[in-house]
Amino acid sequence: MSYYQIIVCILASISYIILLEVIALDLGVLDNIFIPKRFAASTDVAIQLPDRNVTLWSRQAVFGKHFTNASATTVINLYLPSNFQEDMSGCPNRNDTDASYFYENDIIDYDIEYIEQKSYSSKPSARVQKDDGGESKDEAILDFLLVQRGKCTYFDKALEAQRLGFKGVIVGDNRSPSSFRLHYMVAPDKVDESKVHIPSLFVSTSSYNLLWSDLLHSYRQPLKLYAKPEELGDMFWPFLLCFSPSIIMLITVQALAIRKFIRTYRTKSKTRRFIEDLPSRTISREGFYSEEEEIENSTQNGELVPLMDESTRRATFGVECVICLESFTKGDKVVALPCKHEFHRPCIAKWIVDYRHACPTCNTEVPPPKPF
């Protein structure tokens, strides 16, 4: 494995880890670890669609009433706004003179006395009417309004749904359907959160589209849902278990890559030291060796290196470096491998260390293997 392959492997591993973190954060799996203190009151709620046998995840707002009993299941009748074909934001009508509210810094501040009078009496035009034209008398069933994120604050949406008589509101995201991130709905600064008495739930774009589609095909009937408080953070261990095979494989590949890198480094270091310890010969005449050639470091491991006569040397080993294909000239320093083939020291050092641990002429292994 080359350095390039090792770097690519490490970069791919880092990218995979980042991808897992993005998926975990997008699903809210790590929210219970990194949750801010101001959001401690917010709890996730599982919404079940009995007709589809599907469970959707939602997140309660920091303000308003909360579902806290994890053992209790709340029945919800979900409605669309009366003007759902034009506006699904659920924001208050700024031209509505029936409500006594005013604007300050683009935040709506309602008259709390007016809200307390109107909070449990809905406008007939505000929701899809039931077949009998009356309101639900079952206290165990809560009427919720489905709206979409945008145009005003979450607090305004909840307050408007409360003013219309709904017992809760579900706010759908308006981002890409591929995003499953659940937002923490908070009230604006300097706003009295006690004005909202109803629960508010936030769902992803895909969940909102599913609810909206079912309501459109419900033939003017409310959509029945079941809500139960559950912690989405509890999905951390199932999430980890799901991806554990790929994580284990990633760790194994990383360990093998590191082991290969260490072994390659040690082998190259050993080979480099071996080449540096080889005896060096200096050419005294161009094209061949004379008997009077200067010998430097002509001993290896305490033993003398025998010289060969000129004719034998020329016939057997040639008069040029087979790596750079340049003839040996006077003053060149050459080294002889254990197989007696000679090369320029820089050429054979680069060849043996970086390319192949063998003689380029006869393929003899360099350094020679240790005897058993």
Curated annotation (Swiss-Prot):
Superkingdom of this protein's organism: Eukaryota
Residues of the PA domain: 92-215
Modified residues (Phosphoserine): S280
Chief location: Golgi
Transmembrane segments: 236-256
Membrane-topology annotation of the record: Single-pass membrane protein
Alphabetical list of SUPFAM superfamilies matching this protein: PA domain (SSF52025), RING/U-box (SSF57850)
Alphabetized InterPro entries for the sequence: PA_dom_sf (IPR046450), PA_domain (IPR003137), RING_finger_E3_ligase (IPR051834), Znf_RING (IPR001841), Znf_RING/FYVE/PHD (IPR013083)
Stretches annotated zinc finger (RING-type): 321-363
Signal peptide residues on this chain, from the entry's feature table: 1-24
The keyword Zinc is annotated on this UniProt entry: yes
GO terms for cellular component: cytoplasm; fungal-type vacuole; Golgi apparatus; Golgi membrane; vacuolar membrane
Protein name: Uncharacterized RING finger protein C57A7.09
Natural source organism: Schizosaccharomyces pombe (strain 972 / ATCC 24843) (Fission yeast)
